[in-house]
Amino acid sequence: MKKKANRLDAIKMIISSKEVGSQEELLQELGQEGFELTQATLSRDLKQLKVAKAASMNGRYVYVLPNDIMYKRVGDQSASEMLMNNGFISLQFSGNIAVIKTRPGYASSMAYDIDNRESDTILGTIAGDDTIMLVLREGATPTAVRHFLSLIIPNIN
C-alpha cells in the first residue's frame, strides 16, 4: 500500500508543478521518478484523485487536482489564484441576475468556488465555458455581490 501512496503523492506533485496534458506525458514523468505502471493503473489513480482537465494559461488543456488537495505550485500563486487573477473579464447586473464573463475554460471552476462559499447574496450559479450566470438573493445589491465576489476573484473591482 505504501507504494501506491507514494505513487499518488508523486502524481499530485507532478500535476501541481508541471503542465501535463496527457496520460502518456504523465507516465513519462512518473517513469523519470522511478515509478513503473500501466496506463490502466494510472487511469484508476487519476479517477481516485478526482483529477480533471482544465485550460491552462496558454489555452492548452492540462490535468488539475481538486482544490482541497492542490499542492502549492512553484511560484507565488496557487493555480486557483492564478485562475482567478487571469480568467475574469467582466461582471454585469440585471435585476436579480448577474453575469460574469471569463476567458474560455475558466467559468466552471470560478462557479465551483463561488458555490462553495457561504453567501448572503448569491443563491447559486450556472456555468458554461466562458460565462457564469449568478442568481442573486432577494434584496442583494450589486455592491454587496461585488464585495462577496472580490473575496473569491481578487481582480473583480
Swiss-Prot record:
Q: Which GO terms describe its molecular function?
A: arginine binding; DNA binding; DNA-binding transcription factor activity
Keyword annotations for this protein?
Amino-acid biosynthesis, Arginine biosynthesis, Cytoplasm, DNA-binding, Repressor, Transcription, Transcription regulation
Q: Which SUPFAM superfamilies match?
A: C-terminal domain of arginine repressor (SSF55252), Winged helix' DNA-binding domain (SSF46785)
Q: According to the lineage, what is the superkingdom?
A: Bacteria
Pathway(s) of this molecule? Amino-acid biosynthesis; L-arginine biosynthesis [regulation]
Sorted alphabetically, the Gene Ontology cellular component annotations on this record are: cytoplasm
Q: Where mainly found?
A: cytoplasm
- UniProt record, GO biological process: L-arginine biosynthetic process; protein complex oligomerization; regulation of arginine biosynthetic process
* Compartment annotation: Cytoplasm
State the Gene3D superfamilies in the record: 3.30.1360.40, Winged helix-like DNA-binding domain superfamily/Winged helix DNA-binding domain (1.10.10.10)
UniProt-recorded name of the protein: Arginine repressor
Give the organism, scientific name.
Answer: Bacteroides fragilis (strain ATCC 25285 / DSM 2151 / CCUG 4856 / JCM 11019 / LMG 10263 / NCTC 9343 / Onslow / VPI 2553 / EN-2)
